[in-house]
Design a protein with these regions (language model features):
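Bilobed "Venus flytrap"/periplasmic-binding protein-like clamshell domains
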Residues: 22-52, 130-194
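Short, glycine-/small- and polar/acidic-enriched structural segments
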Residues: 23-140, 205, 214, 222-227
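Structured segments of extracytoplasmic/periplasmic soluble domains
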Residues: 48-52, 70, 74-78, 82, ...
Length: 332
């Protein structure tokens, strides 16, 4: 009898939560729509959020600009989009993808764990907008149509598909004296595949999602060095949820970090080893110093947030205390 009572109580409690749940719209950008990884991760997130009294209606978008426009016109309570798009609404969280700032997934886990804690809320909750969740979609790698383009010097003069709203990437391409070919998420893959550009950059999932193997052909390759750690971030108007719900959302999203990383690793491991190009340590050192100089310049231009740059430098130096940057006078 007691077991029956407990079961009935649990069932009634579940119905009570469902009955009083507040319905909100979560608009998700995923290039593959409802079949994509990001959409399905966020479907699971929505299930987990029901315990907080929020019932999300999750809607897929294959055009990121449309998803952002619908959010700004209040058709969506929350939008899930790349940090590169969301940086203008929260420079702190957008700095997670700063060039070369997070060289490994171990360090990325530490960064995201730190940002999910309550102490970070003051940086993520703004007067108008808030970030209520972040999850990884993988390191951005250079896809090159010639695998011998593996040093900084060899990139000079090459045509690089560059997202037209990504100020740090435009700065970097100009810095190495390459040619910016303005692009967006919908067409960068096509430009690489038809030879309009020599180089593009993206996480590993794009290899199949955008069929980048067509652009790699027989001589191309993927430089096995993370340019940046790309994430999907959940943006909402601060007054949409109370502070406790916003924080719980961030914690729930981070609790799914392993799930997201398993997908990232699945995509990276699915790419034939013949495409990967490993750098010499001397070239890695050049990339790291070049990225560091760019981050300092972009901090001065107020594109990157100095507080998060410092946090990420401390995490890097904890992982590699002998790195030259850790003792420099101009360290981040």
């Amino acid at each position: 009898m007691n077991i029956i009572k407990i079961a009935l109580f649990s069932l009634s409690s579940a119905f009570a939560i469902e009955a009083f749940a507040e319905t909100k719209t979560l608009c998700v950008f995923d290039p593959l729509g409802a079949a994509g990884d990001s959409y399905n991760i966020l479907k699971d997130y929505a299930i987990n959020m029901k315990a907080t009294g929020i019932d999300f209606d999750v809607k897929p978008y294959t055009d990121e600009s449309v998803a952002m426009a619908d959010f700004l016109s209040k058709k969506c309570d929350v939008v899930a989009a790349h940090d590169l798009r969301i940086r203008q609404y929260n420079k702190f969280s957008g700095t997670v993808s700063a060039l070369g700032a997070v060289p490994s997934y171990k360090e990325l886990n530490t960064v995201l764990k730190t940002l999910s804690r309550k102490k970070a809320a003051k940086y993520l909750d703004g007067d108008k907008f808030s970030i209520i969740g972040i999850f990884p979609i993988g390191a951005g790698y250079l896809f090159v149509n010639n695998s011998e383009l593996d040093t900084v010097e060899e990139l000079a003069g090459k045509r690089i598909a560059t997202l037209n709203y990504q100020k740090d990437a435009i700065h970097m391409v100009n810095y190495i004296k390459s040619t910016v070919i303005p692009s967006d998420i919908t067409n960068f893959g096509g430009k690489f595949n038809n030879g309009s550009v020599d180089i593009c950059y993206s996480p590993a999932f794009a290899f199949n999602a955008y069929e980048l193997y067509h652009g790699l052909k027989d001589n191309g390759g993927i430089i096995r060095y993370p340019l940046a750690q790309l994430t999907i971030q959940l943006l909402t108007n601060t007054d949409t949820f109370d502070a406790a719900t916003r924080q719980k959302s961030r914690e729930i999203m981070f609790s799914m970090n392993e799930q997201a990383m398993n997908i990232v690793m699945k995509h990276e491991k699915s790419i034939d080893e013949k495409y990967w190009v490993d750098l010499q340590q001397s070239d890695i050192d050049k990339y790291q110093e070049m990225f560091r100089q760019n981050r300092l310049e972009l901090k001065e231009k107020e594109i990157y947030d100095p507080t998060l740059l410092t946090l990420m430098r401390k995490i890097r130096c904890k992982n590699n205390a002998k790195a030259p940057e850790c003792t420099r006078a101009d360290k981040e």
